Regions:
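Histidine-bearing beta->alpha loop at or near hydrolase active sites
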Residues: 33-35, 176, 192-197
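Flexible "cap/lid" loop of the alpha/beta hydrolase fold
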Residues: 79-112
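Catalytic histidine-centered segment of alpha/beta-hydrolase-like enzymes
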Residues: 39, 194-209
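Active-site signature of alpha/beta-hydrolase-fold catalytic machinery across serine-
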Residues: 19, 73-77
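Gly/Ala-rich beta-loop-alpha elbow adjacent to hydrolase catalytic centers
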Residues: 62-71
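Short beta-strand/loop motif that positions the catalytic acidic residue
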Residues: 171-173, 177
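Conserved alpha/beta-hydrolase catalytic His-Asp/Glu region
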Residues: 115-161
Length: 216
Protein backbone atom coordinates (compact mmCIF):
# COMPACT_ATOMS: atom_id res chain seq x y z
CA UNK A 1 0.00 0.00 0.00
CA UNK A 2 1.41 3.36 -1.05
CA UNK A 3 1.91 5.94 1.70
CA UNK A 4 1.00 9.59 1.24
CA UNK A 5 1.72 12.48 3.61
CA UNK A 6 -1.06 15.06 3.65
CA UNK A 7 -0.74 18.72 4.69
CA UNK A 8 -3.88 20.73 5.50
CA UNK A 9 -4.41 24.47 5.03
CA UNK A 10 -3.97 27.51 7.24
CA UNK A 11 -6.09 27.15 10.35
CA UNK A 12 -7.40 23.82 9.08
CA UNK A 13 -6.85 20.19 10.00
CA UNK A 14 -7.45 16.72 8.58
CA UNK A 15 -11.22 17.22 8.62
CA UNK A 16 -10.99 19.10 5.30
CA UNK A 17 -9.99 15.78 3.72
CA UNK A 18 -12.89 13.84 5.25
CA UNK A 19 -14.71 13.42 1.92
CA UNK A 20 -11.73 12.31 -0.15
CA UNK A 21 -11.67 8.66 -1.16
CA UNK A 22 -8.09 7.56 -0.59
CA UNK A 23 -8.83 4.17 0.94
CA UNK A 24 -6.25 2.39 -1.18
CA UNK A 25 -3.44 4.50 0.30
CA UNK A 26 -1.83 4.68 3.73
CA UNK A 27 -2.57 8.27 4.70
CA UNK A 28 -0.42 10.16 7.18
CA UNK A 29 -1.99 13.46 8.22
CA UNK A 30 0.56 16.15 9.07
CA UNK A 31 -0.75 18.24 11.95
CA UNK A 32 0.73 21.66 12.57
CA UNK A 33 3.37 21.99 15.25
CA UNK A 34 3.55 25.20 17.28
CA UNK A 35 5.77 27.74 15.55
CA UNK A 36 8.88 29.11 17.23
CA UNK A 37 9.24 32.87 17.65
CA UNK A 38 10.73 34.48 14.51
CA UNK A 39 10.90 31.10 12.76
CA UNK A 40 10.84 31.34 8.97
CA UNK A 41 8.79 29.05 6.75
CA UNK A 42 11.75 27.03 5.48
CA UNK A 43 12.95 26.16 8.98
CA UNK A 44 9.42 25.36 10.10
CA UNK A 45 8.60 22.93 7.29
CA UNK A 46 11.91 21.12 7.66
CA UNK A 47 11.28 20.74 11.38
CA UNK A 48 7.79 19.46 10.58
CA UNK A 49 9.17 16.92 8.08
CA UNK A 50 11.71 15.65 10.58
CA UNK A 51 9.05 15.31 13.27
CA UNK A 52 6.83 13.18 11.02
CA UNK A 53 9.82 11.31 9.56
CA UNK A 54 9.04 12.14 5.95
CA UNK A 55 11.71 10.43 3.81
CA UNK A 56 14.11 12.80 2.08
CA UNK A 57 13.59 10.84 -1.13
CA UNK A 58 10.69 8.94 -2.70
CA UNK A 59 7.74 10.13 -0.59
CA UNK A 60 4.28 10.98 -1.93
CA UNK A 61 2.86 14.25 -0.60
CA UNK A 62 -0.38 16.21 -0.91
CA UNK A 63 -1.10 19.70 0.31
CA UNK A 64 -3.99 22.13 0.20
CA UNK A 65 -3.59 25.91 0.36
CA UNK A 66 -0.91 26.78 2.96
CA UNK A 67 -0.03 23.08 3.13
CA UNK A 68 0.77 23.16 -0.57
CA UNK A 69 3.16 26.07 -0.07
CA UNK A 70 4.86 24.10 2.70
CA UNK A 71 5.38 21.22 0.26
CA UNK A 72 6.82 23.58 -2.36
CA UNK A 73 9.34 24.76 0.26
CA UNK A 74 10.23 21.19 1.21
CA UNK A 75 10.64 20.20 -2.44
CA UNK A 76 13.66 22.50 -2.62
CA UNK A 77 15.62 19.99 -0.53
CA UNK A 78 13.42 16.84 -0.60
CA UNK A 79 13.20 14.58 -3.66
CA UNK A 80 9.52 13.63 -3.64
CA UNK A 81 8.07 10.86 -5.80
CA UNK A 82 4.64 12.40 -6.41
CA UNK A 83 3.40 15.86 -5.43
CA UNK A 84 -0.28 16.83 -5.39
CA UNK A 85 -1.05 20.52 -4.85
CA UNK A 86 -4.64 21.68 -4.36
CA UNK A 87 -6.01 25.24 -4.16
CA UNK A 88 -2.55 26.65 -3.55
CA UNK A 89 0.27 28.76 -4.94
CA UNK A 90 3.34 27.04 -6.32
CA UNK A 91 5.31 30.28 -6.24
CA UNK A 92 4.86 33.71 -4.70
CA UNK A 93 3.94 35.04 -8.15
CA UNK A 94 0.67 33.07 -7.91
CA UNK A 95 -0.49 35.07 -4.91
CA UNK A 96 -2.89 37.96 -5.57
CA UNK A 97 -1.40 41.45 -5.66
CA UNK A 98 -3.41 42.67 -2.67
CA UNK A 99 -1.24 40.45 -0.47
CA UNK A 100 1.47 43.09 -0.83
CA UNK A 101 -0.78 45.59 0.92
CA UNK A 102 -1.04 43.36 3.99
CA UNK A 103 2.70 42.70 3.86
CA UNK A 104 3.48 46.38 4.33
CA UNK A 105 0.39 47.21 6.39
CA UNK A 106 -0.08 44.12 8.61
CA UNK A 107 -3.40 45.11 10.11
CA UNK A 108 -4.18 41.42 10.72
CA UNK A 109 -1.85 41.63 13.73
CA UNK A 110 -4.42 43.88 15.38
CA UNK A 111 -7.25 41.38 15.02
CA UNK A 112 -8.38 40.06 18.42
CA UNK A 113 -8.04 36.31 18.84
CA UNK A 114 -11.80 35.91 19.21
CA UNK A 115 -12.35 37.44 15.79
CA UNK A 116 -9.93 35.00 14.14
CA UNK A 117 -11.78 31.96 15.50
CA UNK A 118 -15.30 33.24 14.83
CA UNK A 119 -16.85 31.92 11.58
CA UNK A 120 -18.97 34.29 9.49
CA UNK A 121 -20.80 34.32 6.18
CA UNK A 122 -17.75 36.03 4.73
CA UNK A 123 -15.79 32.84 5.34
CA UNK A 124 -18.46 30.82 3.52
CA UNK A 125 -18.25 33.19 0.56
CA UNK A 126 -14.44 33.30 0.40
CA UNK A 127 -14.06 29.53 0.71
CA UNK A 128 -16.88 28.83 -1.73
CA UNK A 129 -19.03 26.58 0.45
CA UNK A 130 -22.81 26.68 0.05
CA UNK A 131 -23.90 23.28 1.34
CA UNK A 132 -25.15 23.33 4.95
CA UNK A 133 -23.02 20.33 5.94
CA UNK A 134 -19.86 21.85 4.46
CA UNK A 135 -20.58 25.17 6.16
CA UNK A 136 -21.00 23.43 9.50
CA UNK A 137 -17.66 21.67 9.05
CA UNK A 138 -15.90 24.89 8.04
CA UNK A 139 -17.39 26.67 11.06
CA UNK A 140 -16.08 23.95 13.38
CA UNK A 141 -12.60 24.09 11.85
CA UNK A 142 -12.43 27.88 12.23
CA UNK A 143 -13.57 27.71 15.87
CA UNK A 144 -10.84 25.16 16.60
CA UNK A 145 -8.10 27.26 14.97
CA UNK A 146 -5.11 28.45 16.96
CA UNK A 147 -5.03 32.24 16.61
CA UNK A 148 -1.30 32.44 17.39
CA UNK A 149 -0.38 29.93 14.70
CA UNK A 150 -2.80 31.64 12.30
CA UNK A 151 -0.98 34.96 12.69
CA UNK A 152 2.44 33.35 12.20
CA UNK A 153 1.31 31.37 9.14
CA UNK A 154 -0.40 34.39 7.59
CA UNK A 155 2.78 36.41 8.08
CA UNK A 156 4.74 33.58 6.42
CA UNK A 157 2.40 33.56 3.42
CA UNK A 158 2.42 37.33 2.97
CA UNK A 159 6.22 37.41 3.16
CA UNK A 160 6.80 34.28 1.06
CA UNK A 161 9.27 35.09 -1.69
CA UNK A 162 9.82 31.99 -3.79
CA UNK A 163 9.93 31.47 -7.55
CA UNK A 164 11.49 27.98 -7.52
CA UNK A 165 8.88 25.33 -8.34
CA UNK A 166 9.00 21.52 -8.13
CA UNK A 167 10.04 19.64 -11.28
CA UNK A 168 6.94 17.44 -11.36
CA UNK A 169 3.56 17.82 -9.71
CA UNK A 170 -0.20 17.74 -10.15
CA UNK A 171 -1.80 21.11 -9.40
CA UNK A 172 -5.59 21.11 -9.06
CA UNK A 173 -7.23 24.53 -8.86
CA UNK A 174 -10.81 25.72 -8.97
CA UNK A 175 -11.82 28.39 -11.45
CA UNK A 176 -13.97 30.03 -8.75
CA UNK A 177 -11.25 30.26 -6.09
CA UNK A 178 -11.62 33.65 -4.39
CA UNK A 179 -8.60 33.36 -2.10
CA UNK A 180 -5.97 32.37 -4.69
CA UNK A 181 -7.58 33.25 -8.04
CA UNK A 182 -6.74 30.83 -10.84
CA UNK A 183 -5.90 33.74 -13.15
CA UNK A 184 -2.56 34.01 -11.34
CA UNK A 185 -1.74 30.31 -11.68
CA UNK A 186 -0.06 28.38 -14.50
CA UNK A 187 0.32 24.64 -15.11
CA UNK A 188 -2.94 23.80 -13.35
CA UNK A 189 -5.66 21.23 -13.88
CA UNK A 190 -8.75 23.42 -13.82
CA UNK A 191 -11.72 22.24 -11.73
CA UNK A 192 -14.89 23.85 -13.08
CA UNK A 193 -16.90 25.61 -10.39
CA UNK A 194 -14.37 24.80 -7.69
CA UNK A 195 -13.72 27.30 -4.89
CA UNK A 196 -10.92 27.34 -2.34
CA UNK A 197 -12.48 24.43 -0.45
CA UNK A 198 -13.32 22.38 -3.53
CA UNK A 199 -11.72 19.45 -1.73
CA UNK A 200 -15.09 19.29 0.06
CA UNK A 201 -17.45 20.48 -2.66
CA UNK A 202 -15.83 18.58 -5.58
CA UNK A 203 -14.40 15.64 -3.65
CA UNK A 204 -15.47 12.92 -6.10
CA UNK A 205 -13.75 14.52 -9.09
CA UNK A 206 -10.66 15.37 -7.07
CA UNK A 207 -10.41 11.87 -5.56
CA UNK A 208 -10.38 10.33 -9.03
CA UNK A 209 -7.69 12.71 -10.31
CA UNK A 210 -5.48 12.12 -7.27
CA UNK A 211 -5.72 8.34 -7.55
CA UNK A 212 -5.01 8.38 -11.27
CA UNK A 213 -1.91 10.49 -10.73
CA UNK A 214 -0.56 8.48 -7.80
CA UNK A 215 -1.08 5.20 -9.66
CA UNK A 216 0.62 6.30 -12.88
Amino acid sequence: MKKIFIFSGLGADKRVFSKLNLKEFEVVHIEWLPSIKNENLSNYVNRLAEYYQIPASGANVLGISFGGMCIVELAKTYDFNKIVLISTAISSSNLPSYHKIFRYFPIYKLFPSQLIVTPTRIHHFLFGVTDAVDRKLLNAIIRDSNSGFFRWALYSILNWDSLEIPKKFLHLHGDKDRIIPIINCNSVRRIAGGGHLMILTHHNEISILIKEYLNE
